[in-house]
Design a protein with these regions (language model features):
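Terminal membrane/secretory targeting segments in land-plant proteins
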Residues: 492-580
């Protein structure tokens, strides 16, 4: 056994390794080896069972040993710089391998059919390479023990599987980020133990097959970014499914019967489809739901009161629909990490999310995934037909990061309770019918990076302190009675008719001048602090103190001799003032 993972920086294989012949486990991961694949290591150590070379700088082709190696069980060469083709006979030379991970390299060409000779293979990960062609039929027939097949982010194409399919124990199938076409193969129905099915970011067409709802072990289904069409299947869910990603397809129909019974759902993403009808009341039974993404559809009617029963919600995106009525004052949005700290976090909910979710933040659509989602929360109700006042209770969402209520018909004033949104980074209330002034309490929102109240009926002076001094004119335009920086107009300009506004025009920038007293005070404090820091450094460090006084002495002597040698010249042109 030899384990040097992450302990030393080698650059090359240790020389003593060339003289080892009875090793069973070798782990040389994370030590930046910059050579080729050590086929000699397999040739010298016929009893070797585990070989881990993860995250190095190994390059060149994958060279097989000279003879069959029947004892190797685990081979992991992920996250290196290997290139070229995967050896066509790899399955013949390594017939008893159970785990193969070659992800994160530069392999190209087709997947060798000889993988089908690995009858004991349980995990095959070839993701994040440059592989092309189709999935070999012999692989789907011969790898009878395969549990995980991960081919994500390559250039594979064609039909996913042929009819001759024998992967009955398959539990995880990830084919996302390729160019597969055709429909979802019926042969997957035989994978009764399938837990994860990710076919996203392909060119798959057709309808969602009804039998996917009968796969009782299925927990994660990702069909997003395809060309799937047709109505949402009715009675689709079994109780085990937790994450459902169907965004950016051509799905249509009503939600009424589609997902009833999916009571363990944590993620429901149906954004960018043609879903119609209303949000059904039974959604309030999804007690585990954390991410509800229904934006960019044709959903109408009011927001159901049952949404208030969902205490685990982190992200709510109902934007770009036809929702009407008031905003529910009981809506919730809290990050998973906050619920965990608060003691109300559900242990069954995931700490991190592997699949990305799109959410608009700071006017830009971002993809969030992994642990980032656990620390993120937001509500987006923009681009609907919502009416009424903004509930003051929304200000109680003190852990929310994004709130977007723009492009509705909301009335009333901006609630002063928004000053409690201590973690908010983006607040968009633009294109409504809000009136009154901008509450001065909002200047206490220290993390606010994007603020937009444009095209309302707001009035009064714009706050010009703290982060509000950084927002530009686009945040406030379209409000006739707002004045101050950065709109470059004051209250006098608003009260006078245009023909008599010369005085206000001449003074329109007066509110934008820098306070000179504050500038002088801050400059003086900064200057004193710099002197104190220099004095502290010289006091603490004897070496620098000695260097400092030596430098002063040398400078004084130079100045003295300069004056003596050039006294006449300096007197004539009065350069004595220059030395002061």
């Amino acid at each position: 056994m030899l384990i040097l993972s992450g302990r030393v920086y080698c650059g090359a294989f240790p020389k003593f390794l060339y003289h080892q012949y009875n090793l069973q486990l070798v782990d040389l991961s994370h030590i930046q080896i910059k050579e080729g694949f050590p086929s000699w290591l397999l040739h010298n150590n016929t009893k070797l069972e585990f070989l881990y070379l993860i995250n190095n700088s190994l390059s060149g082709p994958l060279q097989l040993p000279l003879y069959f190696h029947t004892n190797l069980s685990n081979l992991d060469i992920s996250d290196n710089c290997f290139q070229g083709y995967i050896a066509p006979m790899i399955g013949t030379y390594l017939p008893r391998v159970r785990y193969v991970n070659m992800s994160g390299n530069g392999f190209r060409g087709s997947i060798p059919s000889s993988f089908g000779n690995m009858s004991l293979l349980q995990t095959l990960d070839l993701s994040n390479n440059k592989l092309s062609g189709s999935i070999p039929e012999y692989l789907t027939i011969g790898c009878i023990s395969l549990v995980e097949l991960i081919l994500s982010n390559n250039s594979l194409q064609g039909q996913i599987f042929s009819r001759t399919f024998n992967l009955r124990f398959l539990g995880e199938l990830q084919l996302d980020g390729n160019q597969f076409t055709g429909s979802i193969p019926h042969s997957l129905f035989n994978c009764t133990f399938l837990r994860v099915l990710d076919l996203s970011h392909n060119d798959i067409s057709g309808k969602i097959p009804w039998w996917l709802g009968d796969m009782s072990y299925l927990e994660i289904l990702d069909l997003s970014m395809n060309n799937i069409s047709g109505n949402l299947p009715s009675n689709f869910c079994h109780t085990n499914i937790q994450k459902l990603y169907l965004s950016r397809n051509g799905l249509q129909g009503s939600l009424k019967d589609a997902f009833y019974g999916c009571f363990e759902l944590i993620v429901l993403d149906l954004s960018h489809n043609n879903v119609t009808g209303s949000i059904p009341p039974w959604i309030g039974k999804f007690s585990q739901l954390s991410y509800l993404i229904l934006g960019h559809n044709n959903i109408e009617a009011k927001i159901p009161i049952q949404l208030c029963n969902l205490t685990q919600l982190s992200l709510i995106d109902l934007s770009h629909n036809h929702l009407s009525g008031p905003i529910l004052p009981c809506l919730r949005s809290t990050s998973n990490s906050y619920r965990q700290q608060d003691g109300s976090y559900n242990a069954s909910a995931p700490v991190s999310m592997d699949e990305p979710l799109e959410f608009t933040t700071k006017s830009i659509s971002y993809s969030y995934q992994g642990s980032m989602l656990s620390y993120f929360s937001g509500i987006d109700l923009s681009c609907n037909h919502l009416t009424g006042r903004i509930p003051t209770e929304i200000g109680n969402l003190n852990e929310i990061h994004v709130l977007n209520l723009s492009h509705n018909s909301l009335t009333g004033e901006i609630p002063a309770s928004f000053s409690n949104l201590h973690q908010i980074e983006s607040l968009d209330l633009s294109y409504n019918n809000l009136k009154g002034s901008i509450p001065s309490q909002l200047t206490e929102l220290n993390f606010l990076a994007v603020f937009n109240v444009s095209y309302n009926n707001l009035s009064g002076k714009i706050p010009d302190v703290k982060q509000f001094a950084t927002f530009d004119e686009s945040s406030y335009r379209g409000n006739l009675f707002l004045y101050g920086c950065p709109l470059m107009k004051n209250c006098t300009e608003i009260s006078l008719p245009p023909s008599k506004s010369r005085t206000s025009i001449e003074n329109k920038e007066s509110s934008c001048f820098i306070d000179k007293d504050a500038f002088h005070a801050s400059f003086g404090v900064t200057y004193i602090m710099v002197l104190l820091v220099i004095a502290a450094v010289l006091y603490i460090n004897p070496y620098w103190r000695q260097v400092w006084f030596y430098y002063i002495e040398v400078s004084t002597n130079n100045c003295y001799y300069f004056i003596i040698d050039n006294l006449a010249f300096l007197s004539k042109f009065r350069f004595c003032n220059f030395c002061k």
